[in-house]
């Protein structure tokens, strides 16, 4: 079972790099580009970790 990580980052280049690395390591990654979306994703997905 993959661990879920929510990445909160407004810079799309940085968030893409983080997603690529974590995907390769077997994590299920969700990206939120602002605080409002981060709260929505957190409540919906209940991630194991928020970065």
Q: Model-derived features: where do they sit?
A:
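A generic structural motif
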Residues: 25-29
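Short acidic/polar segment at the start of the alpha1 helix of CheY-like receiver
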Residues: 11-15
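Charged docking surfaces used in two-component/phosphorelay signaling
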Residues: 16-24
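Phosphate-coordination loops involved in phosphoryl transfer and adenosine-cofactor binding
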Residues: 2-4
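Acidic, metal-coordinating helix/loop segments flanking the phosphotransfer/catalytic sites
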Residues: 6, 31-49
């Amino acid at each position: 079972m993959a661990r879920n990580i929510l990445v909160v980052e407004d810079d799309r280049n940085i968030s893409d790099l983080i997603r690529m690395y974590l995907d390769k390591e077997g994590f299920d990654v969700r990206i939120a580009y602002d605080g409002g979306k981060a709260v929505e994703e957190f409540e919906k997905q209940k991630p194991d970790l928020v970065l």
